[in-house]
Amino acid sequence: FTGVIPIAGDQVTSDIAQALRTPTPQAEDIKQKHGCAVTEFTKDDETVEVLGVGGRPPRELSRSSLADIIQPRYSELFDLIKAEISRNGFEDKISAGIVFTGGTSKMEGVVELAESIFQTSVRMGIPSKFKGMETILQNPIYSTSIGLIEHGYKQINHEMLAEQNQGFFSKLLRIVKSEY
């Protein structure tokens, strides 16, 4: 099952940029370094520096205020995903759990927020079958790409094996036909 949901991490970045009146690249940086999807996971003394724009000085923002921007958008995203799963008749299938991939899955609190909405176990998908580049590739941002490469590789191997087998059986059939 695959589906397209029209909001994701970029929408969260846009929300942060608008709420903090900061450029999108800085909002993305703030999201990646300080983002939290569950306000209750933040500590009272945690702050985030927001660079000033147009010559204004930088200002400090509590990390819980940042989470207050992030949490509703991810809740909305997970609600949309849950509705899409139900609409396609797969709600009974998610009891085995959900695997998140991509950069969003790395944010603190995303897994726990998703578990509370989906009412099932959720984990971060991390590629693990590669030797030599583990420190780089064992990152959820590469999960989808690596999975597609692996699927393509298996598909090519399957097709090559089918061609080899077809060649053998074709030869056998020709021999049998020529003898009879």
Map each language-model feature to its residues:
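Helical "lid/coupling" subdomains associated with nucleotide-phosphate turnover
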Residues: 1-180
